Structure formats: structure tokens, C-alpha cells
């Protein structure tokens, strides 16, 4: 991306030349600044957490650093800096409805593992914001923990901030801890965006819930150990963990209203408008769809580039939900046919400077998006028709809740996910009996389990598996990795060994090495996706046969997969 790109964004209301630095420039400036302070600049970690089952997706700059902070691993250097790609979906229902919510963001951070502490951290933060970026010091306000006198002295005496401009807050705002373990106070830096973003109240100041004073950088000082009972002792090794949202910084530097107006997001947002043939800021309902698609296609692109595939569970389901929400809102805007890959191309163009792997994997990303859109388009039209009929019946009966049985019918028969049913109905003032849905789901699972025991896995004839060469085995590596490449060793339909499977066929795929856990020991097997650039296979169950063979039972969603193909 070139600096000129930061000046091409415009809204439907007015043309506005963006000020100073683009997102890619800010990222580069931050990393280079901390490299000049002796930090090792690491590339962003994958969105898939490594050896951390507490997280579904990386959601902060600190998350991949946990092994270094806990001492489980030795950091490559005591001073490290990163720009970490992150996904948070806790507020997914609000994405699009407001201009402040999003699922994808980048977190700038500098970290010290037993090296420098408060003085350097705060002075460098101030130096970067005021001298490197050039923000007005008079619009910056630090906050500290109530009794953190050390931080106060640094801000007041070393940096020269008047005492009345330093705000003291309690534990809820300025102390970082999660139960027992390392913890400590933090110091945040706020930026005053001006009266037009304020609430108008006479007491509006730092800490107000309005959009005038926004927190842009948080410095966490890990200096205590909490024993879990409220007793704190000083840590021998004190650490620094800081975080600053790149997109939020860009809104300030570029003097724009929201994260959807910063240069890279604005270019993507404008592409959405171009593809849909609509304008931004003309109609609020249209704006919701524009913002949602902008956010979701960006998140989806980054998730797929990290090897996450659309599935019905875990992080794969997060991806599937993002793609399908974007696809549905594209239809609401009047877009015909597949369009997400075209938008993903804009994501890649805007972010490849910082994430070159996007360019390297773009064809794979496009294939996954197209396959998922194709699969979704087969279900959504019929599902919407059936849901509309159910709505009419509820309206006639003056009911406000869709029964769990009907919601499950949409899911089981027409492939209509519960969250999509909920979203559509909530827009019209209805709700769903989720408890009833779960009961119907459990009944179906029990019936399916009983049927499998009678008919030998998904209806397949056991003699098909008996024909497989006894020398064929599968290495299970799911404890260490959730996704990797492997070679196909055997393929079957429900009745015979085959050399390939094509779209619409049911069958079983065996590979050399798999991350899929098989049904055994009372635990359900994994589901997911096996794919190549030419085809996608939906794994509906994983079974384990004699001799250590793991069979992935399911159906071809699109394209073709052949024996000896390298799949992911």
C-alpha cells in the first residue's frame, strides 16, 4: 500500500482527505520505533491458539505471549514487539448496527520479560504518540491505578504532565488480574476527540461513556502475584504488557469517525458499495449490511489464511457464521451470485504489506469462500421460504415464539443454522425456543447413534472397509495440531473402493495423518472439512477401524478429490 491510498476514501456525504498516515504506515512506524528501542519485532502469530485450550481464537496481543509470561517457554528476546491480528466475536450481534463494533482488529504491543519496567514503558508510549505520530500532547490524558504513586511520578515528574491531567481510577478500570496468578496495575492513555463526539454533559471528562475521550493505549505492569484470596506479593521478575488498537489509532490520526472510515476499511467498504450498487450513509438499514459485510469478509479472509475451515463446530463454526452472515446481507443489498471472493481480493490488497501470507494463499482463500457461498445458496432460498411460512402461521396465531421443533426442522432438513433463524426473527420482533431446539437436537443425535450401531456407520456396508489394504494406517496428530496437509491413502463410496469422489457423493476418506478425533471411549468423533484447491469434503463423522485406520465419513460439497491428493 502506498501513502496515496490513504487519501482516496470518501463517504457519500462529503469527500474528506485523510490526514497523515495510513494503517500500513502506522503499523510499520510502531514496529520500527520499538526496534530502535532494542525490541525484536515478531510477525503476527496465527489466529489459531497454540497449546492453549482456553481460547477458541487469538483475541489480544498478549494471548500468544502467555508461555513467555508464565515461564513455560523462553522468549526469543527480553524485549519483543508485535502487531497481532485478533478476532473477537462476543459482540457479533452488534456488528453493523453500530460503527464501533467489529470482529477483526490488529493490536500493536511492546513487551518486556523481566527487563525494563514502568519508566521506559510510559516514556516510550508518550514519545511515540507525540514525537513520532505527532499527536497534540494537550489532547492526551493518562490514567493510573488509585495508589500507583510510581506511575504518577513518572507521568508528572519525568514526562511533565500536570497533576490535574492525570486521572486515578479503581481496580475495575486500572488493575489487570484474572483470579490467582500474576497481576498488576495499568496506565491508560486517552485522547480527546473534541466536543462534537461528546455527550454534552457539563461533567463530561476522561472515563465518560461517550465517544469524546477514547482509550488508545494500555500499559499493564505485571508486578504482583495474587494467591487467589486477595493477598498480593511482589514478583521477583516484573513484566510489561502493552496494547494499542491499530484501527483505533488510525481513526485519530486520520481524523475520521469510526473504524469503518480508516483507509483500508474504507477502501473495502467502498468496494462493497460498488459490488452492491448502493451508497453509504444514504439509508441506515443499508449501512448496517455494508458495515457487517466489510467486517465479516475481512475476518473470514484472515481466518482462512491461517488454515481455519468452515465447519459446524468450534472456530470453524465461527468462520462459517461470519461467511453466511455476510452472504445473507449481500442478498439484502440485492447482490446476485457469489461476491465474497471479490471483496476478499480487496482485503488482501489492503493488508498484504503487513501480512504477505494473504497474497500467497489468495487462491485457496477464494476457493473456500466460493465453496461456502455455493453451499449456503443451496440452503438459504428454500430455508427462507419455509421460515416465511412459519412466520405467517405465528402471525395468524398471534404467537411471538418459534417452537424449538420448527427451528430444528429448519436446521436438520434445510441446513438453516439456529443463529441465522434467531437473527432473522429478531429483526421482525420474534424469538426462538432455544431450549426446545436443543431437546430436538438431542433426540436426533440419539436416533442417529442408534442407527449407526445397526447399519455400520452412516449406512455403509462393513465389507467396503474390509477391502482396504491391512497395511494402511493413520497417524493421529490432533493433540498437537488442528490443521495440516496430508495425503489421501484410500477412498470409498458407501459400497466400493474408488479413486475419486465428486460433488454430491457420499463416502469415506482415509489419509496418512489426521487431526480428527474418532468416535470411541464414549466421546463423539470430530467433524470438519477436508479440502484441496479443487474440492471440499464435509466430514460428518470420524470413525476408527481395526489396524488404526481413521475414516472420515461424509459427502463432497463441491469439486472433486482424488486418491493420493494432498489435502488439508
Name every feature range the model reports, one short phrase each.
Residues 2, 9, 14-568:
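A glycine- and charged-residue-rich anion-binding loop/surface
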Amino acid at each position: 500500500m502506498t501513502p496515496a491510498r490513504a487519501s482516496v476514501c470518501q463517504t457519500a456525504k462529503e469527500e474528506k482527505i485523510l490526514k497523515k498516515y495510513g494503517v500500513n504506515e502506522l503499523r510499520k512506524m510502531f514496529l520500527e520505533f520499538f526496534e530502535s528501542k532494542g525490541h525484536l519485532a515478531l510477525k503476527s502469530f496465527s489466529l489459531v491458539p497454540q497449546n492453549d485450550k482456553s481460547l477458541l481464537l487469538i483475541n489480544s496481543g498478549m494471548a500468544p505471549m502467555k508461555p513467555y509470561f508464565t515461564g513455560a517457554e523462553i522468549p526469543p528476546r527480553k524485549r519483543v514487539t508485535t502487531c497481532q491480528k485478533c478476532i473477537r466475536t462476543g459482540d457479533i450481534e452488534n456488528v453493523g448496527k453500530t460503527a464501533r463494533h467489529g470482529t477483526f482488529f490488529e493490536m500493536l504491543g511492546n513487551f518486556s520479560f523481566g527487563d525494563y519496567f514502568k519508566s521506559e514503558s510510559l516514556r516510550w508510549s508518550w514519545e511515540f504518540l507525540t514525537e513520532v505520530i505527532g499527536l497534540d500532547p494537550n489532547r492526551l490524558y493518562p490514567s493510573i491505578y488509585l495508589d500507583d504513586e510510581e506511575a504518577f511520578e513518572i507521568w508528572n515528574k519525568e514526562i511533565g504532565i500536570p497533576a490535574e491531567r492525570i486521572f486515578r481510577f479503581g481496580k475495575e478500570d486500572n488493575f489487570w488480574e484474572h483470579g490467582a496468578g500474576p497481576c498488576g496495575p495499568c496506565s491508560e492513555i486517552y485522547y480527546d476527540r473534541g466536543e462534537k463526539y461528546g455527550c454534552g454533559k457539563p461533567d463530561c471528562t476522561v472515563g465518560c461513556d461517550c465517544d469524546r475521550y477514547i482509550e488508545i493505549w494500555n500499559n499493564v505492569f505485571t508486578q504482583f502475584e495474587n494467591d487467589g484470596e486477595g493477598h498480593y506479593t511482589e514478583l521477583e521478575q516484573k513484566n510489561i504488557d502493552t496494547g494499542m488498537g491499530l484501527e483505533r489509532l488510525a481513526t485519530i490520526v486520520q481524523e475520521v469517525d469510526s473504524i469503518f472510515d480508516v483507509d483500508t476499511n474504507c477502501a473495502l467498504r467502498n468496494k462493497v458499495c460498488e459490488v452492491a450498487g448502493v451508497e453509504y450513509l444514504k439509508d441506515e438499514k443499508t449501512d448496517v449490511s455494508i458495515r457487517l459485510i466489510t467486517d465479516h469478509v475481512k475476518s473470514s479472509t484472515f481466518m482462512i489464511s491461517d488454515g481455519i475451515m468452515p465447519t459446524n463446530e468450534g472456530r470453524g463454526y465461527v468462520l462459517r457464521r461470519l461467511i453466511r452472515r455476510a452472504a445473507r446481507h449481500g442478498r439484502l443489498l440485492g447482490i446476485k451470485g457469489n461476491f465474497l471472493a471479490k471483496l476478499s481480493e480487496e482485503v488482501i490488497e489492503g493488508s498484504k504489506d503487513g501480512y504477505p501470507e494473504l497474497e500467497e494463499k489468495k487462491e485457496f482463500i477464494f476457493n473456500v469462500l466460493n465453496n461456502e457461498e455455493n453451499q449456503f445458496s443451496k440452503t438459504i432460498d428454500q430455508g427462507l421460504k419455509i421460515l416465511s411460512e412459519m412466520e405467517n402461521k405465528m402471525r395468524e396465531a398471534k404467537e411471538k415464539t418459534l417452537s424449538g421443533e420448527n427451528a430444528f426442522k429448519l436446521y436438520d432438513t434445510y441446513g438453516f443454522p439456529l443463529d441465522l433463524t434467531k437473527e432473522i426473527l429478531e429483526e421482525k420482533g420474534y424469538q426462538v425456543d432455544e431450549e426446545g431446539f436443543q431437546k430436538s437436537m438431542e433426540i436426533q443425535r440419539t436416533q442417529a447413534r442408534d442407527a449407526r450401531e445397526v447399519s455400520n456407520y452412516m449406512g455403509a456396508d462393513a465389507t467396503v472397509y474390509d477391502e482396504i489394504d491391512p497395511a494402511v494406517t493413520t497417524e493421529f496428530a490432533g493433540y498437537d495440531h488442528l490443521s495440516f496437509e496430508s495425503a489421501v491413502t484410500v477412498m470409498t463410496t458407501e459400497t466400493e473402493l474408488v479413486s475419486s469422489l465428486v460433488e454430491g457423493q457420499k463416502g469415506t476418506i482415509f489419509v496418512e495423518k489426521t487431526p480428527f478425533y474418532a468416535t470411541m471411549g464414549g466421546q463423539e468423533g470430530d467433524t470438519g472439512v477436508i479440502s484441496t484447491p479443487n474440492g471440499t469434503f464435509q466430514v460428518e463423522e470420524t470413525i476408527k477401524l481395526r489396524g488404526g485406520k481413521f475414516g472420515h465419513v461424509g459427502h463432497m460439497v463441491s469439486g472433486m478429490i482424488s486418491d493420493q491428493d494432498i489435502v488439508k
